[in-house]
Amino acid sequence: KESAAAKFERQHMDPSTSSASSSNYCNQMMQSRKMTQDRCKPVNTFVHESLADVQAVCFQKNVACKNGQSNCYQSNSAMHITDCRESGNSKYPNCVYKATQAEKHIIVACEGNPYVPVHFDASV
């Protein structure tokens, strides 16, 4: 079974591109990363930074998660991200996404040993 840490990497990590290269980026990535298999995942964020830099966030600023849990952490520096949001004409299995690029601080939930990101909570 896929671990929570591996799932985070699959759903949120894209260090090889510095930003969404094309308008088709989200459509391709959401599909290739298997987030459109049984439904269209409505919103997803990809982080264009090294895995080491994102894992390091677990040891940065401790903040409350959206769900009230206390194991979330905010990055000290802004990171290159792409938000993929389902567009109005999207209907499973033909999921259609709109990409928005930004440089924002990310907030992730961390757990385990080693202590690594398992959930993308927000960007600010």
From Swiss-Prot:
Key word Transmembrane helix present: no
Location in the cell: Secreted
Residues at which substrate binds: K7, R10, K41, P42, V43, N44, T45, K66, R85
Molecular function in Gene Ontology: lyase activity; nucleic acid binding; ribonuclease A activity
Region (Disordered): 1-24
Tissue: Pancreas.
Membrane-spanning parts: none
Catalytic activities: an [RNA] containing cytidine + H2O = an [RNA]-3'-cytidine-3'-phosphate + a 5'-hydroxy-ribonucleotide-3'-[RNA]; an [RNA] containing uridine + H2O = an [RNA]-3'-uridine-3'-phosphate + a 5'-hydroxy-ribonucleotide-3'-[RNA]
Active site: H12, H119
Biased composition (Basic and acidic residues): 1-13
Annotated disulfide bonds: C26-C84, C40-C95, C58-C110, C65-C72
GO process terms (BP): defense response to Gram-positive bacterium
Gene3D superfamilies recorded: Ribonuclease A-like domain
PROSITE patterns, sorted: RNASE_PANCREATIC
Family the UniProt entry places it in: Belongs to the pancreatic ribonuclease family.
Function: Endonuclease that catalyzes the cleavage of RNA on the 3' side of pyrimidine nucleotides. Acts on single-stranded and double-stranded RNA.
Protein name per Swiss-Prot or TrEMBL: Ribonuclease pancreatic
